[in-house]
Amino acid sequence: MASCGIGSCAFAGGQISSLKPHTNQLLGVGAGVHGEARVTMRKATTKKLTASASTSPWYGPDRVLYLGPFSGEPPSYLTGEFPGDYGWDTAGLSADPENFAKNRELEVIHCRWAMLGALGCVFPELLARNGVKFGEAVWFKAGAQIFSEGGLDYLGNPSLVHAQSILAIWACQVILMGAVEGYRIAGGPLGEVTDPIYPGGSFDPLGLAEDPEAFAELKVKEIKNGRLAMFSMFGFFVQAIVTGKGPIENLADHLADPVNNNAWAYATNFVPGK
């Protein structure tokens, strides 16, 4: 569902100098403190895209806007230099450059988690409906298995990961994800600070960022698919609360009886707690 996932554009770009300033320019003078370096990098987001990206219909002043020819003039601070900029900001959230840089990073990271999450919600349930055995395939019920007597077997196989302690799982998540996030934000083993959104290097094993034009397009695909995935996850949350079923089962019910299984029918008959 995401044409640009975690292993591709998600962490690519560490070596593409044509699309981002040199590391020393991003760091400014005091790169010794990670926090100061990161703030300096955020201020560096006012750098313009090079010609390779500006020729794309997704970048620059002539880019595609959110309502096409009926969009009107976008705000002056939305110049089309970043992927996913369709010239829409009615709340003025991007008016401050530093807030804009921070929100851009937050959006991209949430997009990546949403793409992984949406896949994780749908795929196990889809496999279970096609004969693959799972302890519990529905995404919002699966985690509770760790509190059962038998614990939680990843992919239904006890020889892979047999989890029995929620504290151990929590500790592993903190350590492993903390290490990855630390690398993404503060750089590699030598301490070189890279772009925290597209760190490249070890995060781009397929070398997808080597072509600047293709990389610029992958960034757009990532943000578009990621925004769709965030809406999908919101829909999955609502479905779980209202119907108590997973997304695949809800889809099957709707296709079997679209008149009685749709958003309007559930909204008009929904009673919280029942």
Curated annotation (Swiss-Prot):
GO CC annotation terms, alphabetical: chloroplast thylakoid membrane; photosystem I; photosystem II
One GO MF term: chlorophyll binding
Binding-site list for chlorophyll a 4: 225
Residues where chlorophyll a 5 binds: 221, 239
Residues given in the record as chlorophyll a 1 binding sites: 88, 94, 107, 227
Keywords, ordered alphabetically: Acetylation, Chlorophyll, Chloroplast, Chromophore, Magnesium, Membrane, Metal-binding, Phosphoprotein, Photosynthesis, Photosystem I, Photosystem II, Plastid, Thylakoid, Transit peptide, Transmembrane, Transmembrane helix
Residues noted as binding chlorophyll a 2 in the record, renumbered to the chain: 110
Membrane topology summary: Multi-pass membrane protein
Transit peptide: 1-41
Positions of chlorophyll b 3 binding: 165, 181
Principal cellular location given in the protein's record: plastid
GO biological process: photosynthesis, light harvesting
Superkingdom of the organism of origin: Eukaryota
Post-translational modification: Photoregulated by reversible phosphorylation of its threonine residues.
UniProt keyword annotation of Plastid present: yes
Modified residues (N2-acetylarginine): 42
Chain positions recorded as chlorophyll b 5 binding sites: 173, 270
Protein localization: Plastid, Chloroplast thylakoid membrane
Entry note about domains: The N-terminus of the protein extends into the stroma where it is involved with adhesion of granal membranes and post-translational modifications; both are believed to mediate the distribution of excitation energy between photosystems I and II.
Family statement drawn from the similarity comment of this UniProt entry: Belongs to the light-harvesting chlorophyll a/b-binding (LHC) protein family.
Assembly with partners or alone: The LHC complex consists of chlorophyll a-b binding proteins.
Protein name: Chlorophyll a-b binding protein type 2 member 1B, chloroplastic
Annotated source species: Pinus sylvestris
